[in-house]
């Protein structure tokens, strides 16, 4: 960073401390209001200078920056702690698929605890004033945690892809397999982060810290190509390809139709093929109630199927993803419970008689063609929106920084604003703030767990088994 943007860092060759508030107006007859409004001569360490509104603006900007960065750090810590706590506390979230989510939350929490605070000090002071040793530690932690966070997204996308495209995957998705993926993610991130500490640094690394007060990861061109390719560009390509294949597979299955079978015929006297009529008003109410319940269940299951296939955090992901291979159910309902004696146990239809006037109790398909097509379009839009949020947030947060990281060592004459470089860096960090939101907001299990953690509520799940 350019260290000349705030008073006290204009001359890096002198060991001059940053002036305190009392030094600003030592030996002068003007106040803060005078300095802001009119400007006046003040004495700082025996040197007369002109305090203007620019100096105060810099001070206000520094204060605002401190508050904003502190809020980002706090939000990142709280969000990822909530995710980890929810998985630890809630038994229905303790499944192998959510181990990847927990590991991602740990990586993002490390970004918030190890990387962001020192980065905030760097931004507020407008220069690295903590020495080469802490710079090495900070850059290594930065690369380790940020790379692990990004590579976890690849592991999550891979897990989803296997779950959607391989019907047998849920049977081999065990702890050993998921833990192997987690170890590979952290191992790759560790290799990239330790390479500069093992000697892969550019010649100006130390001079940049001591003379220019800039703490940057190694600007060696070969290392930057290796690091950016292995921790962003290749993972980005993999994520885009996998999510596109997931979307294509899910859309193809959503659009798959099966013509409903013809309703079972009834005899002239209103009896079903089994010869057992449904005669009473009580029976009619029973049939109607069972149909409405099953219709709700059917619609909910179809609506959630694609979302469960696309999202990693469904507590019931194993059972829900299974349903992706099933055709949408548009036939008449099935009664699988005990029925009154006068109700036919036939699965497809039954007939209700009221006195001499028979009534067909065969329930039509839950949706007509037009309604079905509308529902399919709605589910496809939801799938596209979900994937757009997941991939869009990742690309939006990290792409500017990694373009800059690759351009800087290649183009030695290119000048990138320090403010722009800081913004791109913190935009990448902000992805660790968004991850706990993006990867849990679509899961009702996580939402209920967060509510219980926040409000101590223990709401019974309103899921009915049929």
UniProtKB/Swiss-Prot annotation:
Annotated region (Disordered), positions in chain: 1-21, 255-282, 339-360
Subcellular location: Cell membrane
Cysteine pairs bridged by disulfides in the record: 135-215
Feature: compositional bias, Polar residues: 10-21
Residue ranges with Low complexity bias: 339-353
One Pfam family cited in the UniProt record for this chain: 7tm_1
UniProt-listed Gene3D superfamilies: Rhodopsin 7-helix transmembrane proteins
Segments crossing the lipid bilayer: 67-89, 100-121, 137-158, 178-200, 229-250, 387-410, 420-442
Ranges in the topological domain labelled Cytoplasmic: 90-99, 159-177, 251-386, 443-466
Gene Ontology MF term list: G protein-coupled receptor activity
Name of the protein described by the UniProt record: 5-hydroxytryptamine receptor
High-level lineage: Eukaryota, Metazoa, Ecdysozoa, Arthropoda, Hexapoda
